[in-house]
Amino acid sequence: MCQTCRVGKRRDAREQIEAKIVELGRRQLLDHGAAGLSLRAIARNLGMVSSAVYRYVSSRDELLTLLLVDAYSDLADTVDRARDDTVADSWSDDVIAIARAVRGWAVTNPARWALLYGSPVPGYHAPPDRTAGVATRVVGAFFDAIAAGIATGDIRLTDDVAPQPMSSDFEKIRQEFGFPGDDRVVTKCFLLWAGVVGAISLEVFGQYGADMLTDPGVVFDAQTRLLVAVLAEH
């Protein structure tokens, strides 16, 4: 067998094992939460001695990072598909489609949503170089949709400047995302994001109670439309 073929087979085998580790990690999240992640248990499920799994995942923190990247990527891919599949007649329809896709993913994947937007895992610090880009893809989708509203004139720009250091922070955000909104619009974007994540978390984590809402999805749509209306307020 040629050297290139052997290297390719080893790489494929490694990728398959790494994918299986992530899959088993997802199951652990569902069954035990982030605090219950165990590389030893994953090794047992793979039929490996516990020391062998460390050839693929160096630590529990590394497993958490892999699961974070996996969840952020899956969420963002879901949003991208929803935008592709939705015939949006306006920027506001696009914003609502994004929000619905985020909620749909969260309701389907409550344990993974908890990993992304629940309580931080004690002692774990996500490496920004591996998580920041993928973690902001959904935010970038919102910015893209809202930028279209600015382009149509539905969302008007003003001369309002936020106090420091807020204004400087907003300028960094504009540069990072290529976003044309002024400080007032960026503030409204933060309100939108906080409202969407907060409403979803209240539902997913059971904070509304079992009998309060007959159809949480309808309530979420109403909340999202109110947030969109704020964006267009003059």
From Swiss-Prot:
<dbReference type="InterPro" id="IPR050109">
    <property type="entry name" value="HTH-type_TetR-like_transc_reg"/>
</dbReference>
<dbReference type="InterPro" id="IPR025996">
    <property type="entry name" value="MT1864/Rv1816-like_C"/>
</dbReference>
<comment type="subunit">
    <text>Homodimer.</text>
</comment>
<keyword id="KW-0963">Cytoplasm</keyword>
<keyword id="KW-0805">Transcription regulation</keyword>
<dbReference type="GO" id="GO:0005737">
    <property type="term" value="C:cytoplasm"/>
</dbReference>
<keyword id="KW-0238">DNA-binding</keyword>
<keyword id="KW-0804">Transcription</keyword>
<dbReference type="GO" id="GO:0006355">
    <property type="term" value="P:regulation of DNA-templated transcription"/>
</dbReference>
<dbReference type="InterPro" id="IPR001647">
    <property type="entry name" value="HTH_TetR"/>
</dbReference>
<dbReference type="Pfam" id="PF00440">
    <property type="entry name" value="TetR_N"/>
</dbReference>
<feature type="DNA-binding region" description="H-T-H motif">
    <location>
        <begin position="38"/>
        <end position="57"/>
    </location>
</feature>
<feature type="domain" description="HTH tetR-type">
    <location>
        <begin position="15"/>
        <end position="75"/>
    </location>
</feature>
<dbReference type="InterPro" id="IPR009057">
    <property type="entry name" value="Homeodomain-like_sf"/>
</dbReference>
<protein>
    <recommendedName>
        <fullName>HTH-type transcriptional regulator Rv1816</fullName>
    </recommendedName>
</protein>
<comment type="function">
    <text>May participate in the regulatory network that controls the expression of MmpL lipid transporters. Binds to intragenic and/or promoter regions of rv1816, mmpL3, rv0204, mmpL11, mmpL7, kasA and mmpS3.</text>
</comment>
<dbReference type="Pfam" id="PF13305">
    <property type="entry name" value="TetR_C_33"/>
</dbReference>
<dbReference type="InterPro" id="IPR036271">
    <property type="entry name" value="Tet_transcr_reg_TetR-rel_C_sf"/>
</dbReference>
<dbReference type="GO" id="GO:0003700">
    <property type="term" value="F:DNA-binding transcription factor activity"/>
</dbReference>
<dbReference type="GO" id="GO:0000976">
    <property type="term" value="F:transcription cis-regulatory region binding"/>
</dbReference>
